[in-house]
């Protein structure tokens, strides 16, 4: 097993060298006069150097970081020493805030390259990657994008040097995915703003500063009237109340923060907060998908190595067909996740730097699918790795137990898999209602519509697409029959009327995600023909998954929605009494 997490990862190198359209990324990021070959060579050298450090220094500390966990002494919360040492090395390499502009001390790297670095870190130790991404990268990116020149000069160089660590505080005890319920307030007093409220589940919350989402327009509600604010902790300006005791990413402090008269400065203008935080959330969801790839890669490599060494019944266990099937499923998950996620990362660069409107629409379509597939896939890959290891899989020295534990947070934070499903299906239904005729053709997805039928791979992907479109047609038909043809003319519907779609959103998302993975691997196989068997395997899986989900929707007996209606009525009676 190579200790260079870039050059030693054949699938990642193949994607970098032969699949990712770097010339488009370079032109978008650095302008049409730049030299793509020279720029990409520089990026490759950075990743190779980082991959060597991560493989030789960060990965060996992972078990110890997990064992020690967060340090809680004398009322303070801090990272443990192995974690600190790993992050110190990254800062010394100039990789604390690799996406921040070079003129502010950052690496000036595009989103795609930054995500490759994130994947390697997550493979080595997910907790360390969380601290790096949320503690340094995210605050710097938000301040660069929305802060004043003064705020940029004050904070970004210090974040980029690793002198301070920040966080992004959005979640509250009563406001998780339902952001509009937050109650933390910001009140203008002279030249500054005063924050009051509580935040919970804040990754890297032990740092020296934090970006806070708060309500700053009096009388506003929901997602209106929010703002983002920068607060420093120095002098007790806010309190790190505690770090949660958790069984996932144990080395990363997940903190509760208390703001009582906290002085802060605003990023941008009052009322811009939701628009601003949405950019962070969408990029973070792609980032969490990338985390899933790193964890799945680690689990897959351990399983492959063990299956080649462990002999049972006279042969290595990888030669037993059921074990081989598990290993091939893991390979498909990892390569499929990686191919789809970096397609989305490239689109993000084209949309963000190149102002490409079609890329923006495409990455919006892919983002919830990447978050869903890569994180659910990571859990599945870790579960398979545990099974391949048998009894020793639950022994700490084999690491797969840590991978399994850490993977479980991935489908939860930055929007659960179910929230991603609602997002994906909401946009899909908008597209269908704009163009109902798409349901008698190749469907509303432009990317899925370009699948060619000239081979078995294409036929399987087309069948999966047809199953997904048929599922949409079935669900929409139920709603039309119950509520009238006005639905197709944009009539507003209640949550109760949308029940069939809300119930089956995750099934539909699973079908769409698998179909997109098969499509992306098929397009990759055109560039790298050796990848055709892998793409065909993914296409067969997509066809089977979409058929299963279509049947599940067809056989729905309505009992779940009946139960929901009963609980809704019970709540209504309780509220009236």
Walk through the language-model features, giving the residues of each:
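C-terminal helix-coil-helix/basic helical segment that borders enzyme active sites and/or dimer interfaces
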Residues: 335-371, 386-389, 491-502, 522-529, ...
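Internal helix-loop-helix
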Residues: 51, 80-153, 157, 161, ...
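A glycine-rich, basic-preceded beta-loop-alpha segment at the flavin cofactor/substrate interface
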Residues: 234-241, 246, 253-284, 301-319, ...
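C-terminal amphipathic alpha-helical interaction region
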Residues: 450-577
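A short core secondary-structure module
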Residues: 192, 196-238
């Amino acid at each position: 097993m190579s200790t260079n997490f870039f050059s030693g990862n054949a699938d990642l190198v193949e994607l970098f060298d032969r699949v990712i359209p770097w010339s488009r990324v370079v032109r978008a990021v650095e302008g049409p006069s730049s030299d793509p070959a020279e720029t990409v060579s520089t990026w490759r050298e950075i990743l190779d150097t980082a991959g060597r450090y991560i493989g030789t220094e960060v990965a060996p500390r992972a078990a110890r970081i997990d064992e020690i966990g967060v340090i809680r002494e004398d009322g303070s919360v801090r990272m443990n020493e192995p974690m600190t040492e790993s992050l110190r090395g990254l800062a010394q390499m100039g990789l604390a805030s690799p996406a921040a502009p070079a003129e502010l001390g950052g690496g000036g790297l595009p989103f795609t390259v930054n995500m490759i670095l994130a994947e390697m870190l997550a493979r080595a130790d997910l907790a360390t990657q969380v601290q790096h991404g949320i503690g340094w990268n995210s605050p710097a990116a938000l301040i660069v994008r929305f802060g004043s020149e003064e705020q940029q000069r004050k904070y970004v160089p210090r974040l980029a040097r690793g002198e301070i660590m920040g966080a992004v505080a959005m979640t509250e005890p009563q406001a998780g995915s339902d952001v509009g319920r937050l109650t933390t307030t910001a009140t203008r007093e002279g030249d500054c703003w005063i924050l009051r409220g509580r935040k919970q589940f804040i990754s890297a919350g032990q740092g020296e500063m934090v970006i806070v989402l708060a309500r700053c327009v009096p009388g506003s509600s929901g997602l209106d009237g929010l703002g983002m604010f920068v607060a420093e902790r120095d002098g007790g300006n806010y309190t790190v109340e505690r770090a949660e005791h958790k069984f996932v990413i144990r080395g990363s402090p997940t903190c509760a923060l208390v703001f009582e008269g906290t002085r802060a400065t605003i990023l941008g203008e009052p009322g811009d907060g939701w628009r601003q935080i949405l950019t962070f959330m969408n990029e973070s969801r792609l980032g969490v998908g990338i985390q899933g790839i790193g964890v799945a890669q680690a689990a897959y490599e351990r399983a492959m190595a063990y299956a080649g060494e462990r002999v049972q019944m006279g042969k290595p266990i990888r030669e037993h067909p059921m074990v081989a099937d598990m290993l091939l499923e893991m390979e498909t998950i990892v390569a499929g996740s990686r191919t789809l996620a970096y397609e989305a990362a490239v689109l993000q660069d084209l949309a963000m730097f190149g102002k490409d409107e079609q890329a923006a629409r495409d990455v919006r379509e892919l983002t919830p699918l990447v978050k869903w597939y890569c994180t659910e896939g990571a859990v599945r890959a870790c579960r398979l790795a545990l099974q391949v290891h048998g009894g020793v899989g639950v022994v700490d020295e084999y690491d797969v137990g840590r991978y399994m534990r850490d993977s479980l947070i991935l489908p939860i934070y930055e929007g659960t898999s179910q929230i991603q499903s609602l997002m994906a299906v909401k946009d899909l239904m908008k597209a269908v209602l704009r163009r109902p005729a798409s349901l008698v053709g190749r469907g509303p997805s432009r990317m899925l519509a370009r699948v060619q039928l000239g081979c078995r791979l294409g036929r399987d992907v087309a069948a999966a697409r047809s199953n997904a479109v048929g599922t949409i047609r079935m669900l929409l038909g139920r709603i039309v029959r119950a509520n009238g043809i006005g639905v197709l003319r944009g009539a507003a519907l209640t949550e109760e009327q949308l029940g069939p779609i809300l119930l089956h959103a995750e099934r539909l998302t699973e079908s769409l995600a698998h179909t997109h993975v098969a499509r992306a691997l098929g397009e990759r196989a055109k560039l790298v023909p050796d990848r055709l068997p892998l793409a065909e395997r993914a296409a067969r899986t997509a066809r089977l998954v979409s058929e299963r989900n279509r049947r599940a929707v067809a056989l729905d007996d309505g009992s779940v929605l009946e139960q929901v209606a009963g609980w809704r009525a019970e709540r209504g009676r309780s509220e009236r009494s």
